[in-house]
């Protein structure tokens, strides 16, 4: 009986991991699409896709949150399992924000397109680093690889540096 319950719980955790992977892929798609819109001529279809992807990300967040709540209420996990579920809840919140930010980029695309090439290059490079962060963070979570998770911090520093460069370029263009 106890083994059956644990097996069911492990299956549910695997399902949670699979849903996190799907949500991460949606975030990657939204970021890639948003950046592509800023680099090229008008893409109404791609703009619509990014906004729809953000809606899918929002739905996925609710679905995963529901999975987590069911796991917490039905299984009453402790220690490591509780940390896994609480980490998943934090991750989905962060990934949902990434989807929102991709939508924001789409809305700002007309202004970004008018910017200089260096600005766009930094933005594109920053987006690529964010995609790597999303991919590596989910992969480290699913594999429970602490060292890989620590390496994600490096990407965060790189993204911060790109962001600072973009802000500098933006200030230069205003002056």
Regions found by a protein language model. Give the residues of each.
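Cytosolic, long alpha-helical scaffolding segments
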Residues: 1-175
């Amino acid at each position: 009986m106890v083994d059956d319950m644990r097996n069911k719980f492990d299956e549910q955790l695997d399902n949670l991991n699979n849903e996190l992977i799907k949500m991460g892929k949606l975030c990657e798609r939204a970021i890639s699409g948003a950046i592509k819109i800023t680099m090229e001529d008008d893409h109404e279809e791609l703009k619509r896709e990014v906004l729809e992807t953000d809606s899918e990300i929002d739905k996925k967040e609710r679905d995963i949150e529901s999975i987590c709540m069911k796991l917490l209420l039905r299984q009453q996990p402790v220690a490591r399992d509780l940390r896994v579920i609480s980490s998943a809840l934090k991750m989905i919140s962060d990934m949902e924000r990434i989807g929102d930010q991709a939508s924001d980029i789409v809305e700002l695309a007309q202004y970004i397109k008018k910017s200089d090439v260096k600005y766009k290059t930094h933005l594109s490079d920053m987006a690529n680093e964010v995609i790597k962060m999303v991919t590596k963070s989910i992969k480290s979570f699913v594999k429970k690889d602490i060292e890989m998770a620590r390496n994600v911090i490096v990407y965060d520093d790189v993204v911060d540096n790109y962001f600072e460069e973009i802000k500098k370029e933006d200030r230069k263009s205003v002056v």
